[in-house]
Amino acid sequence: MITSDPELFRRMSAVRSPFTRGPWYAALKLHPERDNITSHIDERIHADLRTRMAPGYSGKENLHMEYDIDEKLLHMFDLMNSKYVSRPEDSIFRTMDLSRMTSFFTLDVISKIAFGQTFGFLDKDDDPFGYLANLEQFLPAIIVFGVYTELTNIMKMPLIKGALPKSTDKRGLGRVMGFARERVQERFGPKPIVRQDMLNSFITRGLTQAELESETLTQITAGSDSTASALRIALHFISTSPPVLDRLLAELSTAIAAGKVSRPVIKDSEARQLPYLQACIKEGLRIHPPVSGLMAKRVPDGGARIEVDGVEKFAPGGTQIGWNSWGMMHDPEIFGVDCEIFRPERWLPRDSSEKEQARVLRMTETVTLNFGSGRFGCLGRGVATMELNKAVAEVGRATCMQTYVSAVMRANRFPQTLLRFNLQPCSLAKPFNQKVIGFTVHTDMNFIVTERMTAEQQAAAVQAMGEADADAGALPGSYDE
């Protein structure tokens, strides 16, 4: 069965719920020999791992977490500025694939905060061992095995097992597995490296070297792809929605002027206090949910009564119930009749009435299910939201759709906070390619990046635009709003 009912999803995931993780989760066993926190079906083992791993994700024991994220964000900006800035006045045009750039950013972030060492994707501006392409090929197989669970038995066959990724591989998922293994071994060697990071927290709480080799691989895959997907979708919709961009820039400008935004990168605590920024992030998570895997729960042996379309029905024991993330996040009863539209304003209370507060709360409780719920909630939620808070704010305030530049210049309302660059999608007709394979994978999200205009350049451009209109015989006032 599949449900788009958030109440049922929460009920199945509640701490004392008799529902358990179904065999779908077993397909998430990325290491060929060992399970991980996402693939364990045994509830006791899963609960024990969550207890021991949660402090490492909280940030309280990872003193470098926010600094490391800031460092990688600035690294990404440096790369964009040095390699991808176009100069139309010199007929120099370069394209940047935002889907790859955001993946490089999140992969380097998770490796840095987990191990204290990055893969170097941003350094190389490349995927040197073909990890992303290999993962795109590997994910559909995981989803098929999760649905047709009997197929997982063939993974035990020597011929198939030998073809699976190994830590000795030079490319793809196996190379990531090898990187994780090397970093773990450094913490257990004769001269172990000690650093206040996630890995150290896990070791302190008794995870073995073998367990860590499996868990760190899961950290990398699950912790980077979903966040990158959420980030690029938010940036895409913000950059292609001028009213949204204007309002976000206005909020950030006001906060900066009031000294409520740190430089060079906004603090996570500051970003959480900006209502429209938070609305943009939530709307991005809603409009294109980053995770689409079923996450199927198993009905207890005695069966359970569940509500379907307002009618209570009996589900036999052993039934698998997965979630429909798209249906849940596009439910008009929860998000309004315009739920197919990217409109962050839906998250802002229209008044202080209890009814309005309840409406926003219901939406918020639903969209947070993108991170799971209850005893199955994502441990990395805090890390992911910190990345989104910072990256959407910093890139969003540095972004302006050049498709609409002329209209903005005519109105003479260029925002003064475009500190870094403008972004223009290369194609509005087909802005990117997309595959829904457990995660929502985007490719070819190509943008043109240009330097921002100074105040003097803006004034000159406005004057030049007016002269061009006169030369073209434009009607007076034809561009007035």
Where are these regions (language model features)?
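Cytochrome P450 I-helix active-site segment
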Residues: 70, 92, 130-137, 239-291, ...
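Short, small-residue alpha-helix embedded
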Residues: 226-239, 391
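Cytochrome P450 heme-binding "Cys pocket" and the immediately downstream C-terminal segment
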Residues: 82, 242-244, 354, 363-364, ...
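Cytochrome P450 C-terminal beta-domain/meander region
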Residues: 201-210, 265-283, 294-323, 341, ...
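Cytochrome P450 substrate-recognition site 1
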Residues: 1-65, 107-108, 126-155, 324, ...
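Conserved cytochrome P450 K-helix/beta-meander segment immediately N-terminal to the heme-binding cysteine loop
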Residues: 323-358, 464-465
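N-terminal membrane/targeting module of cytochrome P450s
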Residues: 6-28, 44, 48, 312, ...
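Cytochrome P450 heme-thiolate monooxygenase catalytic core
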Residues: 22-30, 64-231, 247, 268
